[in-house]
Amino acid sequence: MQLILLEKVANLGNLGDKVNVKAGYGRNYLLPYGKATAATAANVAAFEERRAELEKLAADKKASAETRAAQLAELEVTITATAGDEGKLFGSIGTHDIADALTASGVEVAKSEVRLPNGTIRNVGEYDVAVHLHSDVEATVRVVVVAA
């Protein structure tokens, strides 16, 4: 399936690239989320007319992500959770909890932007958490988990 990318897609290509992808990936992900359009002659011509507008939009998104990353770099978030005597939490701290704490601190962060490669946080302590704001912009936030 031939598609034209309308924005940068990780491990696939940049804005305006003509890519050949499997039909399921194109139909179920790229097309519904507005990340690509079918590479027909009419769509190619329409894309070339809108290219400057889309490039400006992509640059604005990246600039916005960079300002949010600068705000997040200065931030340290404290999350209080109930824990046992040895510092093990009753439950866990996940991406949703971290995103809510960051949003409460004044920087809007979606749950899907928070990355926990080692899984949820299950112990009291300090953790460095990656926040993936844009395909080119990633920030690290210090999360402190304290016992209630």
Swiss-Prot record:
Domain of life: Bacteria
Cellular component terms (Gene Ontology): ribonucleoprotein complex; ribosome
InterPro entries per record: Ribosomal_bL9, Ribosomal_bL9/RNase_H1_N, Ribosomal_bL9_bac/chp, Ribosomal_bL9_C, Ribosomal_bL9_C_sf, Ribosomal_bL9_N, Ribosomal_bL9_N_sf
Presence of the UniProt keyword tRNA processing in the record: no
Keywords: Ribonucleoprotein, Ribosomal protein, RNA-binding, rRNA-binding
Disulfide bond is among the record's keywords: no
Gene3D superfamilies, A to Z: Ribosomal protein L9, C-terminal domain, Ribosomal protein L9, N-terminal domain
GO MF annotations, alphabetized: rRNA binding; structural constituent of ribosome
SUPFAM superfamilies: L9 N-domain-like (SSF55658), Ribosomal protein L9 C-domain (SSF55653)
Record GO biological process: translation
NCBIfam families, per the entry: L9
Record function comment: Binds to the 23S rRNA.
Recorded family membership: Belongs to the bacterial ribosomal protein bL9 family.
UniProt name for this protein: Large ribosomal subunit protein bL9
